[in-house]
Amino acid sequence: MKDPSRSSTSPSIINDDVIINGHSHEEDNPFAEYMWMENEEEFNRQIEEELWEEEFIERCFQEMLEEEEEHEWFIPARDLPQTMDQIQDQFNDLVISDGSSLEDLVVKSNLNPNAKEFVPGVKY
């Protein structure tokens, strides 16, 4: 006859699953939870390398901006789109001539009238 205290519905305890003081029985090393510190120097070195790399990239961007300002490659007044008022002012400043000054310009020209027409991207 079976002992009623050993019924099959109660959970059975296996020796491998026994946990004592928050550690499993298999952990013979009491310092196992601190083993991550073993590689702390390597981790710190890697983080320090990443910080140096970020600083280097930041310095490169700063130098590029200073170089751009030094050579005036970007001039907002020149490079940004103009407002409608500025365009209208420029349009009003245009002068329609009677064509006589254009004929004088053509007569004094040093350009070859028999030259081929320039087309961008086409090699001759």
Swiss-Prot record:
UniProt region (PABPC1-interacting motif-1 (PAM1)), positions on chain: 22-75
Organism per entry: Mus musculus
Matching entries from PANTHER family are given as: POLYADENYLATE-BINDING PROTEIN-INTERACTING PROTEIN 2
Instruction: Give the gene name.
Output: Paip2
Annotated domain remarks: Only the PABPC1-interacting motif-1 (PAM1) interferes with the binding of PABPC1 to poly(A) RNA and translation initiation.
Name where it mostly resides.
Answer: cytoplasm
Q: Where in the cell is it found?
A: Cytoplasm
- Family, per entry: Belongs to the PAIP2 family.
Q: What is this protein called?
A: Polyadenylate-binding protein-interacting protein 2
* GO CC annotations on file: cytoplasm
